[in-house]
Amino acid sequence: MDVNTGNVLAMASYPSFDPNWFINGLTPEQVDYLMKSDEAAETTPARNKAISMKLAPGSIFKMCTGFAGLMEGVVGIDETIDDESPYYVKDPETGEAIMQNPVKCWTKYPQRHNNQTIIEALKNSCNYYFCEVANRLGIDKLADWAKKLGLANRTEIELTGEAQGTIGGQQDLYDTGKLQAWVKQPVRG
């Protein structure tokens, strides 16, 4: 996407198909390929997955988490956070881990990112740093900032089938499946 105009410069969806198939009519095999059964509807080649699938944003959401943390004052621009990977999500009442698989940074143990500022954490895409910022914010403030930044809205791109964003909140906090899928940076009690 062109950051100045919002114009789409490139887009891909896989599996793909050859649009020339439609010139002389589709064979039964091509129809079957394009219109997979309902249980595989999300992966049908006829669907533009780049704009229609609702997927966890992954590391791109770290910018939202960091911005929200700075705006709410829970992290300073020059403050460092030590990567003590892995990041365990804990029940605030019991202190027990509520996730069997703690969030790990992409670096391999024993390597870690050590003390980092937000700029270094973005550069290194450090999961631990943004888990800690998300924890300091709380899930509802993080969700509010995601909404303020327009992540719950359609982009109004001139292509049909665009899905609207979905943002979780406190009610999703202890559904660990939703929590992991929501931001890939869960909060810790």
Predicted regions located by residue number:
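Beta-lactam-recognizing serine transpeptidase/beta-lactamase-like catalytic domain environment
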Residues: N4-S59, C64-G189
